[in-house]
């Protein structure tokens, strides 16, 4: 109903239908990788969105190993990456044998010798063994005096001022020879109330001093620290120490083991002056299963499988497979690396919206690269060779190329689009490659669908290939596969409104119209070949694609054909020399 129609109707309540319930189709963000690997700390097996390398270090720390996840993430952002997802893996099944990952922690006792507080690191790892936690009493922010005597059994008191007192405040009563503590349940005018009766007497002419008891907790990790002030011992307080720490600390969790005790018994007798202990990394016992993970349903998806339902991800990278080979008991041969890489490609094939970026072990040579390529035949994977040399903290380190390649893909998508081949692009933050390749070497690798990385003299070090691992010529190029994957993601996201609509010709026409408009714009943007839209794509959604059988099964079927642009891999010069013709005259 239009606003003009309402002008000519009497006042009342009218229903206005909205026929534009669907969202116009648009391209999703692309070039978003999911990384799986080893970190110093951070949530285990739970994907974390990371927006910069500094953000990565804040979440996951800086592992004191020559592993490859951190330099891969750094290389991704250095080369133009926008954001990514990271899953930290550790072996969690080896706790009984003493080899699995474990949280560091400590148990603290109060003045009575009872265990009062349990401190546990937020995540597994030996990093927690360097944590120091200090409980420190604070001087009172306010003080007041008792104005009426208190007898044993009292549950309320009249005081000179209630400024600085509120529900949950732990209050100390003190005269010349004794102290008592209560947790306030109510504050009203110049009266305070509590639940547990006092067992001693306090006189107003004592005098009896009242003050709120607060403290602070300081947590140190190296030169960094977290500090939480004005904390309360009472669970009824908004500043209850366990609640504040558990909601705001990035490093530890605290459990109050004596919540029913009197407030003065809930805290440690003195500051913890030694580090937490017992933290283990669980890295030496990593297996392929730890990287692959498991899918036990929502909230229980681990490792690589945790990415399967994050549809924003369109690249997969696991550079730490190469570190595990030779460093962990579960990766004794290259076959174990191959198992995980096959699962990467398998996930990409199941989701149809991502590509696995693969690499070889460090000491592989040219022939090894050609042999590794034969292990795969899929347009959902791409293989890069050789490794890169980077400088970290003044030391040269060789790293797998997947993180840097993911950054180049993200940069190319941002500057041009997913239809542009992510090749002939300079790799930033790299000083050399592990093995130099001649033009003939690179050509041979390219012919066998291995993407070479080559120094190009003054043009820097560049990715010199854009091929998938498919033997199908139609799906040979990365940009072709990524165009198709991007379309899948766009259609999956923006056609959700179709679900439960009446499956009738009117719906088919709307779907055909919207997809045609969308693909026409992509053709204008250079994503498809063809001089006209008819040459570039077609959309079919009619009675032919939606038979009675399909409709009875609750399906609406749309057939789409596109012709993505392909890269120019070779530049051919044809030169002809003409001899001067003799002058017969």
Language-model segments: residues:
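Small/polar beta-strand repeat architecture
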Residues: 175-256
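Long, low-complexity, polar/charged, intrinsically disordered or flexibly structured peripheral segments
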Residues: 254-300
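Short, surface-exposed secondary-structure junctions/capping segments
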Residues: 148-153, 241-269
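A short, compositionally biased
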Residues: 113-115, 163-167, 207-216, 556
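Short, cationic low-complexity segments
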Residues: 141-144, 238-242, 580-585
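Autoprocessing Asn-cyclization modules and mimics
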Residues: 102-121, 126-200
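Structured, hydrophobic secondary-structure cores that serve as assembly/anchoring elements
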Residues: 1-124, 172-177, 220-223, 302-585
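Short intrinsically disordered coil segments
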Residues: 50, 133-137, 150, 232-234, ...
């Amino acid at each position: 109903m239009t606003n003009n129609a309402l002008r000519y109707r009497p006042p009342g309540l009218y229903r206005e239908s909205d026929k534009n319930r669907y969202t116009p189709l648009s391209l999703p963000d692309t070039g978003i990788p999911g990384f799986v690997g080893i970190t110093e700390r951070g949530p285990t097996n739970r994907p974390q969105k990371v927006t910069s390398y500094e953000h990565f270090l804040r979440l996951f720390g800086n592992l004191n190993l020559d592993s490859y996840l951190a330099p891969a993430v750094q290389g991704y952002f250095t080369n133009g990456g926008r954001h990514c997802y990271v899953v930290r893996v550790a072996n969690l099944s080896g706790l009984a044998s003493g080899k699995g990952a474990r949280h560091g922690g400590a148990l603290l006792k109060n003045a009575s010798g009872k265990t009062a507080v349990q401190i546990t690191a937020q995540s597994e790892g030996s990093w927690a063994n360097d944590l120091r936690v200090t409980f420190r009493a604070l001087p009172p922010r306010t003080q007041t005096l008792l104005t009426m005597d208190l007898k044993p059994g009292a549950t309320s008191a009249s005081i000179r001022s209630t400024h600085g007192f509120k529900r949950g405040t732990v209050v100390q009563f003190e005269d010349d020879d004794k102290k008592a503590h209560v947790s306030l349940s109510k504050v009203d005018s110049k009266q305070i109330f509590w639940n547990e009766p006092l067992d001693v007497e306090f006189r107003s002419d004592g005098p009896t001093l009242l003050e709120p008891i607060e403290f602070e907790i300081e947590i140190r990790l190296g030169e960094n620290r977290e500090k939480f002030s004005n904390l309360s011992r009472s669970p009824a307080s908004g500043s209850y120490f366990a609640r504040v720490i558990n909601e705001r600390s990035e490093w530890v969790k605290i459990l109050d083991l004596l919540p029913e005790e009197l407030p003065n018994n809930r805290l440690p007798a003195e500051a913890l002056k030694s580090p937490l202990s017992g933290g283990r990394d669980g890295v030496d016992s990593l297996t392929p299963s730890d990287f692959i993970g498991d899918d036990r349903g929502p909230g229980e998806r681990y490792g690589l499988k945790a990415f399967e339902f994050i549809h924003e991800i369109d690249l997969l990278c696991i550079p730490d497979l190469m570190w595990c080979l030779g460093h962990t008991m579960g990766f004794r041969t290259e076959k174990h690396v191959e198992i995980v890489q096959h699962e990467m490609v398998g996930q990409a094939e199941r989701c149809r919206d991502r590509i696995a970026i693969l690499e070889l072990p460090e000491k592989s040579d040219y022939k090894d690269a050609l042999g590794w390529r034969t292990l795969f035949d899929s347009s959902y994977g791409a293989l890069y060779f050789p490794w890169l040399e980077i400088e970290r903290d003044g030391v040269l380190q060789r790293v797998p190329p997947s993180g840097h390649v993911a950054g180049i893909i993200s940069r190319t998508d941002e500057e041009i689009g997913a239809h542009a081949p992510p090749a002939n692009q300079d790799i930033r933050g790299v000083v050399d490659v592990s093995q130099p390749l001649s033009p003939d070497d690179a050509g041979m690798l390219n012919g066998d669908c291995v993407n070479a990385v080559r120094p190009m003299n003054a043009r820097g070090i560049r990715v010199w290939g854009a091929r998938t691992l498919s033997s199908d010529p139609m799906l040979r190029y990365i940009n072709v596969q990524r165009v198709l994957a991007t379309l899948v993601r766009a259609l999956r996201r923006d056609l959700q409104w179709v679900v439960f609509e009446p499956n009738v010709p009117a719906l088919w026409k709307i779907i055909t119209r919207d997809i045609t408009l969308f693909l026409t714009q992509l053709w204008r943007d250079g994503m498809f070949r063809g001089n006209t839209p008819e040459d570039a794509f077609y959309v079919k959604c009619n009675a032919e694609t939606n038979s009675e059988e399909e409709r009875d099964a609750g399906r609406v079927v749309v057939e789409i054909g596109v012709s993505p642009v392909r890269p120019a891999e070779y530049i051919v010069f044809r030169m002809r020399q003409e001899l001067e013709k003799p002058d017969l005259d």
